[in-house]
Every structure is written in C-alpha cells, then in structure tokens.
Amino acid sequence: CVTGVQTCALPIYCYQRYYDDVLILLKTGLRISEFCGLTKHDLDFENHTLNIDHQLLRNQEGYYIETPKTKCGIRKVPMSEEAGKAFQRVLKRKKTGKGIVIDGYRNFLFLNQKGMPMTACYYTSTLRNIVKKYNKYHDEPLPKITPHILRHTFCTRLAQKNMNPKNLQYIMGHSSIMITLNLYAHASQTGANMEMRSLIA
C-alpha cells in the first residue's frame, strides 16, 4: 500500500501518456487484467459505473479473454467523477485500432503504439520505470509499485474510511468476505501506526 502523498505523487510524475491509466487504476481498484480488458462498451457514463465481466490475458499463444472464476467477479464498479474525466480523456485521444477482435470483444480502450491491447506485464514494467525515474530526482523515494499494489491501495483507503465491508467486497470482486476483512485489519494497523507516530513526534 502506498501513502496518500505517494498516491498523489505517482500520477503527477507519470509520463503524460500513462497519467490517466495510473489514475484510473488508483480510483477504481480494478485487477490489471480487468483494466486491460475494458472496452468502450463497458463504460456507463449515465449511471457512473464500469461493467466488469471479463479479463484480458496473454500467453505465448496470444491474447485471450477469461471470464471471472466466481460470480463475485461480475460486477458494476462505481465510477468517480475524477475517474470519469480520465476515461473521457482516454476516449478523446484513442486511436482507431486495427479492428482487433479477441474472443468476441472489440474496441479495447488501452492500446499500445501498434494498436494492440496493453497487457499486465507492460504496466508492471512501466510502473517500475516510472518509480525508478522518480526516485532518481527525489529525496523521499517511492516504494516498489505494481498494478496489484494500486488495487490494494484503493481498497485500503476505502477500508480506512469505514466503508461497509460487504459493499467493499462487491466493488473489489472478492470471492470471500475474509479477503476484504483482512484489508480492514491492515488498514487499522496502518492507521494506528500513523497516529502513534504523530502523537510521539
């Protein structure tokens, strides 16, 4: 989990090309494979939600779509105003792809320079490079950051704000409430440590 200050610093320092990608990951808590699989048809601006019912993956044989292993993975994730604006910017600058269709899905939002969908490995590498560049010029370094850490950070922030655990479980698509409750325990410990440090400073 990254701190609030680090959460703000990361998108700001990102290359302009990846600013909205990182912001959306921080503001939605999506799994990176869910994020990469987003298509234009998954955006519901009228109801401010994201339709999550598939993941985009890639192996040695190529791209493929995988549906959630449990029904908990199928959900409508709330879209904040900030995330909504980021998606609008993504759509505005989106280049027309090669008309690629993967297992019946088309119009993917996040494409590389060749017009092919981005993958989890690409974002993992990109975040590593962004952190490395940031740390080169700042005295207070960022920790290791991965797409999963951004998801964990999103979830922890909502737990710290005492969101109803069942609601948070739904948003995150956790198969078990225990996964969600463990994050509440982590959030409580983190909050206690921060408060203790502020009191004895």
Q: Would you name each region that the model predicts?
A:
Residues 9, 61-65, 161, 182, ...:
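DNA/chromatin major-groove-contacting recognition/catalytic segments
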Residues 42-49, 163-183:
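Short, polar N-cap/turn motifs at the start of nucleic acid-interacting alpha helices
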Residues 9-38, 46, 72-74, 82, ...:
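Basic, Lys/Arg- and aromatic-enriched nucleic-acid-binding interface segment
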Residues 11-18, 28, 77, 95-108, ...:
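Short, basic (Lys/Arg/His-rich) helix/loop patches that form interaction surfaces
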Residues 53, 80, 111-113, 185:
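Residue-level detector of conserved, well-ordered beta-strand and adjacent loop positions
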Residues 28, 37-95:
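Conserved tyrosine-mediated DNA breakage-rejoining catalytic core shared by Y-recombinases
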Residues 1-8:
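Single conserved hydrophobic/aromatic residue that forms the stacking wall/gate
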